[in-house]
Amino acid sequence: MSHSDLPLANAVPLDKIRYNDQGLVPAIAQDYLDGTVLMLAWMNEAALAKTLATGQVWYWSRSRQELWHKGATSGHFQKLLGIRYDCDSDALLLTIEQKGDIACHTGERSCFHQLDGHKSPPPADMLTELARVIGDRRDHPTPESYTCKLLAGGDNKILKKIGEESAEVVMACKDDDPEAIAGEVADLFYHTLVALAHHNVDLRAVYRKLGDRRR
């Protein structure tokens, strides 16, 4: 793959990127599906050029003082899908597809998996976070939880609620009530996420299908 064949590659003004006094620029890798920040590393001019030329992400290892092909050892390669630079041209944001869904050398999905020294999932978009909470309710049920009661009721209870919420979305739209529409769509999204959890369908599989729809 040539530099010009890579999506957005020609939009990166290599001569305008501002490197620090060590010849490096910080590069943030972000998951293309749910926006999770996966890692922060560094690039020099050679790493950025190699990334654009190959379509796979290369960094500069400050400890080893050499180019670092992400995933060359672990198999957790990063496929570059997009790249942006900030307003000062001294930081890069890489939109990537993370192979193996693991970016951190510890085996965690994201390097940002700790909060105040304690393990915590990285922040993501609202639907992803809600899906995570629902999955946690499924795996660690509590009797007072509405979500747990829905899951315990199985398809009959969950699908009945989806049908009810779908009808309420239709009625809110017919009434042209923006606030009601937002509320009913939120309820429909929530109950649909419960159905996904019940059937062990990862929300990112849905995101991939949505990505296919926009092509």
UniProtKB/Swiss-Prot annotation:
In the N-terminal section; belongs to the PRA-CH family. This is Histidine biosynthesis bifunctional protein HisIE. Disulfide bonds: none annotated. GO terms for molecular function: ATP binding; phosphoribosyl-AMP cyclohydrolase activity; phosphoribosyl-ATP diphosphatase activity. It is found in: Cytoplasm. The keyword S-adenosyl-L-methionine does not apply. SUPFAM superfamilies: all-alpha NTP pyrophosphatases (SSF101386), HisI-like (SSF141734). GO terms for cellular component: cytoplasm. Residues 127-215 are annotated as: Phosphoribosyl-ATP pyrophosphohydrolase.
